[in-house]
Structures are given as structure tokens and as C-alpha cells.
């Protein structure tokens, strides 16, 4: 009786694991360079979150469907190349946010294809014992958890650092220009953890 109840609770909580309890940035410590460096503006955070979701979900689904048939030494290379192709194809999706956002993200756009979050989830679902539905649920919830933390950090840093949110001046009680530097991103991330 108790085991069935535990399984039912775990099945329901899987939808929220990546958001709160097993957040990839706060709890897992994955993708910290993105959370620290890119979160100086909300446009950058939304853009990188869109690109991560567009690459993470199909790549983890590929790993769950074909991972058991791939050699263990070649699978991470294939996942990285597949993710990079998806990211390059999805860059036009972020250009309507702001024309200069692709330039401001710089090297972090191609680095999305080799981040720890992607390779960890692909490795987890590469064996044939796990169902692709669980891979899809985890990829979506981890993408949403990543986006939530990225946008929260960016909102705090942009508002308190410049008094602007998404290019619109918003009255802030005070502005601290030092909150825009990378070191402060580490401190804010630690406070949220």
C-alpha cells in the first residue's frame, strides 16, 4: 500500500522536479556560466532560455529513442552535434526579441550545445529502460526551471543595476551599477540557492 502511494506521489512530482525541487541551476549546479554571465538583461535571459528549450527537448528525446543503439563513446558527440544544429536553426527565433541579442550573447550561443544540463539528461535517458515520455517531461521541466531562474536573476540584476526592465525605464528605489558585474551574479545565485 505504501509503495503504491510513494510511486503515485513520485509520478505527480516528476512534472515539477525541474522547476523547484531539482532545479538544474540552483540545486544541480548545472549551467552556472549562463546564469551568472548572461543574466545582465532580461532579453538575453529569455533568448538563451528559448534556445536551450529548443535544443534540450529534441536532443533528450533523441537520446531516449536512439541512445541504446549508439556506441557509448560516440553518443555524446552525436548529441552535441545534433544540439548545435538545432541551436543554429533556432537562432532566427530570438531575433524578433531584439536584433542585437544574438551579438550580445556571443560565445554562449554555441556553448549551449555542450552544457552540463544537456549531457546529463542525455546520459540519463540513453539506456532503453526508461520511457521517452519521462525524458520529454524531464526535458520540458528542466527547461522551464532554467528559464525561471534565468529570468528571475535577470529581472533583479537589470532592475536594480540600471533601473530598466526590457528596455523600459522602471522606477527603482536605488540603482547599484555594480550588480551588473559577473561577481554579483555569483552572489545572487548563491542567495537564491
Model-derived features: positions:
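Intrinsically disordered, low-complexity non-transmembrane regions of multi-pass membrane transporters
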Residues: 1-16
Amino acid at each position: 500500500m505504501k509503495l503504491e502511494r510513494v510511486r503515485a506521489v513520485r509520478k505527480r512530482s516528476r512534472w515539477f522536479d525541474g522547476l523547484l525541487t531539482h532545479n538544474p541551476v540552483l540545486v544541480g549546479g548545472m549551467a552556472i556560466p549562463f546564469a551568472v554571465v548572461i543574466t545582465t538583461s532580461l532579453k538575453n535571459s529569455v533568448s538563451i532560455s528559448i534556445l536551450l528549450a529548443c535544443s534540450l527537448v529534441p536532443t533528450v528525446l533523441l537520446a531516449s529513442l536512439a541512445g541504446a543503439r549508439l556506441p557509448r563513446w560516440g553518443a555524446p558527440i552525436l548529441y552535441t552535434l545534433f544540439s548545435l544544429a538545432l541551436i543554429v536553426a533556432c537562432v532566427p527565433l530570438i531575433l524578433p526579441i531584439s536584433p542585437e541579442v544574438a551579438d550580445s550573447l556571443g560565445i554562449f550561443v554555441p556553448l549551449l550545445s555542450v552544457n552540463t544540463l544537456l549531457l546529463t539528461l542525455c546520459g540519463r535517458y540513453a539506456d532503453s529502460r526508461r520511457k521517452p515520455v519521462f525524458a520529454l517531461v524531464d526535458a520540458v521541466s528542466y527547461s522551464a526551471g532554467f528559464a525561471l531562474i534565468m529570468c528571475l536573476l535577470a529581472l533583479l540584476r537589470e532592475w536594480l543595476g540600471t533601473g530598466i526592465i526590457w528596455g523600459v525605464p522602471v522606477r527603482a528605489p536605488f540603482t547599484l551599477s555594480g550588480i551588473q558585474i559577473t561577481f554579483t551574479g555569483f552572489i545572487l545565485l548563491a542567495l537564491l540557492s
